[in-house]
Regions:
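Intrinsic disorder/low-complexity segments enriched in small, polar and charged residues
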Residues: 4-6
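Cytosolic regulatory regions of ion transport systems
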Residues: 10-181
Length: 183
């Protein structure tokens, strides 16, 4: 199976060789647009975005140095038009877990995309890691912004006065820093 650290290794290899990292983002909603903004700012990245909303795509193209493709995120034809066969990474960030997972499956099966990341919000999927793998649903890394925010809030409640809590070595040590504004 693939390791979760694979995307980092791939990115590091590309940056060392001074090549462009070709990234395909699926979904131009809040999460997808934010990811596109941050990734497109780096010169080493070439970003393409797929979405079904032409207005959102036009707006992104006006604001960012990205290529846009109109269509359904999991459609083989749309992925082909976006150049999925030449992508180093697919990041599926639509609002649908199922579309994100199917898009990763299509990218893997038809285009042999090396790294596939999917936004998966439902704990029903996330709580079953055995669903994911090269011979299963080929998602190298599942991300859930909602769960990250929830975890962060839970830690802040557990450690009042800290604005950030960091875990080290599987929660054996916790570091929190308290910041008070000066009047």
């Amino acid at each position: 199976g693939r390791e979760a650290a694979k995307p980092v290794k791939l990115a590091a290899a590309h940056r060392t060789a001074n090549l462009l990292m070709k990234i395909l983002i699926l979904g131009a909603g809040q999460v997808g647009s934010t990811a596109a903004y941050h990734l497109a700012r780096e010169e080493a990245n070439e970003v393409t975005i797929i979405d079904s909303n032409p207005t959102v795509l036009r707006d992104l193209q006006d604001r960012l140095d990205v290529r846009t493709v109109l269509g359904h995120a999991a459609s083989p034809g749309t992925l082909e038009r976006a150049g999925c066969a030449n992508m180093d990474m697919v990041i599926a960030l639509t609002s649908s877990d199922e579309v994100n997972m199917i898009a990763c499956q299509v990218a893997h099966t038809l285009f042999s995309t090396p790294t596939k990341i999917a936004r998966v919000r439902s704990s029903e999927y996330i709580s079953k890691p055995e669903l994911f793998g090269t011979d299963r649903i080929p998602v190298d890394l599942c991300i859930s912004p909602e769960q990250l925010v929830t975890r962060h809030i839970e830690q802040l409640i557990r450690y009042p006065g800290a604005f950030q809590v960091l875990d080290f070595r599987s929660e054996e040590r916790r570091v929190g820093k308290e910041c008070r504004s000066r009047w």
